[in-house]
Amino acid sequence: MDSIYKKFPSNMAPGDFWRQIKRTVNGEPVSDEQISMIVSTIRDTLQLAPDDQLLDLACGNGALSQYFFDDCHSFLGVDISEILIDVAKRYFEQPNRKFVLKDVGEYIVSEPCPQRFTKVLCYGSFSYFPELTARQVLTRLNREFVNVDRVFIGNLPDLELHEAFYTDGKSHDHELKMADSLIGIWRSPSEFEALAEDCGWRCSIQRMPREFYAGHYRYDVLLARDRA
């Protein structure tokens, strides 16, 4: 699985964390208030507990991951970008809070002890997974990561709202289903619900507050198991 983040962050200063992962508005890093909104939403939704072992898929440079270190027992972040993982290791890695360089599609089938994890996070990255990878990730999380009871997938682009993002008056239909496009694959909430259910998950759609900078065209998802 290729990624726009393999080379793009090389243009950024090592400590320019939010620009490195394009958490920006008009090229400028989003405000601390916006980051706090993201962090609070993830915390509230994942319901992290002191004994949780958190897996962060496509974790980027760890700038967001670090906010959850004190909320869980252990942490593993996985990303395909050598540049971003180097930043994560340099600035954020700690004992029991580790980052590894690996393609998520490869990692999800090679993790030697998937049952150790209890919660999963994937923020702002899922739309860049090719369709087969997206389906494989969700299916493997359900079948092999058997102790994971909640998965938060954040900042998904809503197909029904793409014109709120593309305001240039041109048609962008040709790129809405391309994983390697600027935003990745756009899915309507109903499309994502169908995908999640096909992979064994119960899916809940969430919306950020109106003041969230991307709330007019993105949504979040909570995946949970049906415990018999």
Task: Kindly give the residue locations of the regions a language model identified.
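Short glycine-rich, flexible loops that bind phosphorylated cofactors or substrates
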Residues: 128-129, 160
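A short, conserved alpha-helix within the catalytic core of class I
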Residues: 129-141
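Nucleotide donor/acceptor-binding cores
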Residues: 52, 118
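Class I (Rossmann-like) S-adenosyl-L-methionine-dependent methyltransferase catalytic domain
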Residues: 1-46, 50, 61-97, 101-111, ...
